Amino acid sequence: MTIKISICTSVKIFNNNLCLLILPLLFVLTGFNSLLQAQDRNYEDVIIMGVYAHPDDETSSGPVFAKYARKGAQIVLVVATDGRLGVTDLTDLEAGDELAELRREEMQCAADVLGADLHHMRYHDQLRAPEGQDLFIQESRKIIDELHEIMGEWQPNVIITWGPDGGSNHLDHRIISATVTQVVLSKDWEQRPSLFYSGTQIPDLGELWKYRGVHEDFLTVRESFSEEDVDVAAEAARCHSSQFGPDLIDSWAEQWRHRGHFYFRPFEAPRAKADDLLNYPSQYE
């Protein structure tokens, strides 16, 4: 009865019989009921969408996608570019159509391993920015149009993408982060999805913290996963053999197993309306 007494005392309910009647309501109000419901959730009704720039970017959250696929959720991966500029020492291919075709095959392989549906757009890396600003803007708007259609078709419950840092400050990553945010902000949703940005805590980045780090106060979602999920994610990453060598993937898998979780920053919906910037309630109070 210790729990009952401590709860009742905290709300100044000293009659034991009355406390027993009110306790169920207290559990609802304090979120215990929600937690119990979450344990019994039917994940088959859940759609989780990852939106990325390149084939292989999904590896950044691979264990998370593997986790929810294992639970029965539908995973949808959306990849904007064909990866034609992803030249490495792992193949003899130069930038261009042949490399793009190989990377499309690799991306399909990874999606199959993760148990995900795949929408692979065919935009050029950098959205043809080297060819001029006007063409870049045209390509950027085409992606927005296409994402509106894809997201409207799937109506995802959750969307995961890069944060404004792009993970590695990559131009394409940052463009996709901004593009996904724009679609979520502008679309008239039947049910607005929860948007999450991948993030890395500052202590994990050393001297790179200023360019890629996210303060822990913003990384409020700590998503855990199992060793089984790591195994699936590593197998999916091995599909991208033109980009990652086996030793690198093994090192990632070891890090994932040791850490056991990833951090995400939620895109927070407005909490109030105001007619003055200084009158808007601070989210940090």
At which residue positions do the language-model features occur?
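N-terminal secretory signal peptides that target proteins for export/translocation
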Residues: M1-N15
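Short intrinsically disordered, low-complexity coil segments enriched in acidic
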Residues: T2-I3, L26-L29, R271-A274
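Bacterial N-terminal signal peptides
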Residues: C19-G31
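Active-site beta-strand->loop->alpha-helix modules in alpha/beta enzyme cores, enriched
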Residues: L35-E190, Q283
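The feature marks non-catalytic terminal segments
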Residues: K187-E285
